Regions:
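Short hydrophobic/Thr-rich beta-strand motif most characteristic of the beta2 strand and flanking loop
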Residues: 25-32, 40
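Active-site beta3 strand of CheY-like receiver
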Residues: 44-50, 55
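C-terminal output helix
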Residues: 106-116
């Protein structure tokens, strides 16, 4: 089963996300702050991470940067799911290394499409550079 780590400190947001992703067939784990998210990612080795930006202890931008800087977690796709709609937040998240950015409230079908796209891309072998 595909494991998704959700890093979300708002109980209501997590409950909705957990319920919908579980119904879609994913195994969902939760971390409630950025530091916990970084540690859980190392331990769980999830297939994908969905992360908020406004997190206690370590914000989502910094947590993303740390995950992408570590050899044991840099391969894990990260989708930022945030209420920040401004372009500067999106640009900062992409610069930190996230693979996709969605705003809340999320269109769940678009979110699942992006999850599937990132998981398929991760499973594909790298292109042969000799050709």
């Amino acid at each position: 089963m595909i494991k998704i780590l959700c890093v979300e400190d708002n109980d209501d947001n997590f409950f909705v996300l957990h319920r919908r992703l579980t119904r879609a067939g994913y195994e969902v784990k939760v971390a409630t702050n950025g530091l916990e998210g970084v540690e859980w990612a190392k331990t769980l080795q999830p297939d994908l991470i969905v992360m908020d930006l406004n997190l206690p202890k370590l914000n989502g931008w910094e947590a993303t940067r740390r995950l992408k800087d570590q050899p044991e977690t840099k391969h894990i796709p990260i989708i930022i799911l945030s209420s920040h709609k401004e372009q500067a937040s999106r640009d900062r998240a992409l610069a930190a290394g996230c693979d996709a950015y969605h705003t809340k409230p999320a269109d769940f079908h678009q979110l699942v499409e992006k999850i599937e796209t990132l998981l398929k891309a991760r499973a594909m072998p790298p292109p042969d550079a000799s050709q």
